[in-house]
Amino acid sequence: MQLDLPQHCMSCLVLIITYMNESGSKSSGVELTQDNLTAKQLDYAVFLPAISGFYATFVGKQRNEPYVDPARFPQGLTDMEQLNWLNSTKALFPYRWSLASGGHANLDLSKQDWSEDMVRNREPGTFILGDSGGFQIAKGLWEGDWRANSGCAKAQKKRELVLNWLDNVSDYCMTLDIPTWVIHDKKAAKACGISTLPAAVAATKFNNEYFMKHRKGVRNGGTKILNVLQGDNHGSADQWYETMKEYCDPAKYPDTHFDGWAMGGQNMCDVDLVLRRLVALRYDNLLQEGVHDWMHFLGTSKLEWAVLLTVIQRAVRKYVNPAFTISFDCASPFLATANGQVYYENVFKHDSKWSYRMGPSADDKKYATDTRKWSTGVVADGIYNNWQESPISDMLTMKDICIYKAGTPKTGVVLTEENFRDPALYDVLPDVNKNGKWGKTSWDSFSYALLMGHNVWMHLTAVQEANQRFDAGERPAMMQRSTGDYAKFEDIVEAIFAAPDRQTAEDIIKLYDTYWMEIVGTRGFKGKKTKNARSQFHVLYTFDEPEVDTEPEDQLQSEALQLLESEQIK
């Protein structure tokens, strides 16, 4: 069977799976076309899709039962595992790295939970970075008094459960840190009992010491632990580092020291601070090969940062630690879908802004019988000007997503926002969802899952294509200084790490102080005030705060995904 491959699959791997009948003769042949993103990763900084529990439920539960009736699958999808990028043999786009959050997981590993199986029973050789749930503490979602030495039984039980989960599920994980933005949020501070920077530092130290004392240990098959660095400005970030760095020191803790670093707060969105911190780590002997081989940047969604972090990773490998890897994550592919947004193209304009573009998608019950190919329909009907095909969207028709049919109202009835749910107004009732309800949307829960998978592929390929283009000589505007010597970012980073001593390296960083102000960080920060301004990702900034450059993914509301998950039938 010969397939006509779309443009993006020209470099795909094709596996031939031959099914034999009982007599041994060939009964049929199926070609599984895989876009092997693991093979395309090369030496780039590693993007980790932050797996949504909503999405993982489809993969996991289908292993035990027909959670989705196979008759609901679009033509070409024969196995839910095709949507599981952690499955190297069956996935449409194998990719072996991901992030899973303990904050959203069922932490009780003593009982089978098929909705968790995508992560719990993943293929050997795949990589999971476990997030510990500090965000849930700060938001008050994990109830309890989280202050150091509070004696709170609820908080202690959660510490025990999350460490056990991380030790048994992840390859690397984050410490149970308290994000410093909590001290600027009165509601959050009240929920967790932490309202000052010293209290956040003390609570994190308490959690660090618990993790250090009770971790399984790498030699015993346990997870490696990343020391999370917080701070909402340069001063507090420096204070946090000086306080917490000892936990990664093998001289002080030869058997239980932490195994790398995670950049949170201002550390993960401020290039000046990132470079200064790496120089400090180098000269504090805390980037040792085989000891501190991993650094993760939390919640990093800017496409240009995929290239920026690759440049930094390569410099550290060249001059400090050949085994060093930088990873970064975001949940944008899942959040976007929950907000009705779908990635439709990635944009790479030399010496300009690089970005993934997302927009409101087709959601109309008139499409419930529309057999047009999805990409054809959304462009023809003006929903998108362009559509970049993914291995998932390539299978879809309009009716595969817009699954619910509209009802037929009685003659003379005008449906409104107030009355459209009244069954007495219909001759033929609208389709109902799994919960026996009907609403305005034409999507069922599997529609969301399919488009989430598409969005993940779009995000992953955007990151890889950005690095490929950069290596070929193209660059986003922020990777070159716009004034003065017009220095390229990679040349400056090379000079910093090639410097003969710490002072020289720090002087080079200081020399380019105005350039660092040009680089837009995660959550849109840009400008000199980032050195002192607070960093809270849950607020919408005004220009009274640091200048910002926001993108669609900055405005996605996490509540939409939480609502979707809460309505999901487990």
Regions found by a protein language model. Give the residues of each.
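Cationic, low-complexity basic patches in intrinsically disordered or flexible, solvent-exposed regions
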Residues: 3, 8
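Gly/Ser/Thr/Ala-enriched C-terminal appendages of enzymes
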Residues: 322-569
